[in-house]
Amino acid sequence: VITIGVKLTTVDRPRALAEANDNIWFSAGVHPHEAGNEADACNVDAFLSAADHPRCVAIGEAGLDYHYDYAPRDRQAESFRAQITAARELDLPIIVHAREADNDIADIIEDEMGKGTFRGVLHCFSSRPELARRAIDVGFYVSFSGILTFKSAAAIQQVAADSPEDRILVETDAPYLAPVPMRGKPNEPAYTSHTCLLYTSPSPRDVSR
């Protein structure tokens, strides 16, 4: 289980959970919603320091959110790039949040990849196929939440079906987005089995993998 950091000023909380539980790790980052409020949202050294812990396994949640626009877009982008730099230096994957910002997300990932390779995942994917394709082309993973099981998610289901099996991940986004048939309940890691079953049917994929 990975508990996600969304602010540097509160990274001690996911860190404490990871320190207290052998099956929990954490990420360190600034969510795009918080990019305008966090003084160190664009400070690479601050991310390097926050992630300097044996239980930290990723940078993020970072990225762009143009749906709510809680932070200025240029500030979101600057913070995203700073976190990519930290991820590259630490050789940790970056967890990417993308909402209504597909082109800018892909452009930044491709531009930063030209400065030096780094690893990452498009978290809780709900975007257009082109973003998945461009991210996969540079080595990213695409992670699907319980949204994949929703009746309204035909387009996302098609992205999953069209993506290489070795680039697909499944997640909870707990406590939100519980998959069918658990909708309405707090989400939990055990429920990822329902998302996996949707992904593997009707294709002959091995859900155990």
Where are these regions (language model features)?
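Glycine- and Gly-Pro-enriched alpha-helical subdomains that act as flexible
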Residues: 95-109
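Short, glycine/acidic-enriched loop or turn micro-motifs at the edges of active sites
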Residues: 32, 64, 100, 126, ...
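Active-site gating/metal-coordination segments in enzymes
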Residues: 8-93, 138-141, 146-151
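Short, well-ordered alpha-helical microsegments
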Residues: 10-12, 102-106, 128-132, 153
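N-terminal binding-site loop/beta-alpha segment at the start of enzyme catalytic domains
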Residues: 1-8
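Single conserved hydrophobic/aromatic residue that forms the stacking wall/gate
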Residues: 199-209
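Active-site-adjacent C-terminal substructures of enzyme catalytic domains
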Residues: 57, 112-201
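Catalytic beta/alpha-barrel core
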Residues: 5, 93-99, 121-125, 146
